[in-house]
Amino acid sequence: MRIIEGKLRLDGSEKVAIIASRFNHIITDRLVEGAKDAFLRHGGNEENLDLVLVPGAFELPFALDKALSAQKYNGVCCLGAIIRGSTPHFDYVAAEATKGIANTTLKYQKPVTFGVLTTDTIEQAIERAGSKAGNKGFEAMTGLIELIDLYKGL
């Protein structure tokens, strides 16, 4: 049996976009820093990294669709932080952002990763943005790097 999997490497020519929500920017700024760090550590060229900022997580699928339709990116890393409040708003935003990103990924058949935190508390979000639980932005970018390499090999 032949095993096909992506490697954690870039050759410097890959063009990548990070699409991040500004809402909860105290968290998303850290996620972006982690994603950028992963991109550069694994051979990415900073000139080939674009940061697209949208108002909130609900707008991520729109920007993702626009970025992928332009056909200039090898992959896109989506980042956001949705923190539960006292109303059902969290459930709607989390569900629609997730569904929109998944549907857009399948529509364009390009590597996309989901680095959108969905947490019950701000403390949980902080833990996942570079504190106790690592940086999920870094993890989302390393996943994207592997997918880009896998995409080239399939």
From Swiss-Prot:
GO terms under cellular component: cytosol; riboflavin synthase complex
Entry keyword annotation includes Transferase: yes
Function: Catalyzes the formation of 6,7-dimethyl-8-ribityllumazine by condensation of 5-amino-6-(D-ribitylamino)uracil with 3,4-dihydroxy-2-butanone 4-phosphate. This is the penultimate step in the biosynthesis of riboflavin.
Organism of origin: Nitratiruptor sp. (strain SB155-2)
Annotated positions binding (2S)-2-hydroxy-3-oxobutyl phosphate: S86, T87, R128
InterPro entries: LS, LS/RS, LS/RS_sf
Active-site residue list: H89
Protein name (Swiss-Prot/TrEMBL): 6,7-dimethyl-8-ribityllumazine synthase
Reactions this protein catalyses: (2S)-2-hydroxy-3-oxobutyl phosphate + 5-amino-6-(D-ribitylamino)uracil = 6,7-dimethyl-8-(1-D-ribityl)lumazine + phosphate + 2 H2O + H(+)
Any Pfam family matching the protein: DMRL_synthase
Superkingdom to which the source organism belongs: Bacteria
Family: Belongs to the DMRL synthase family.
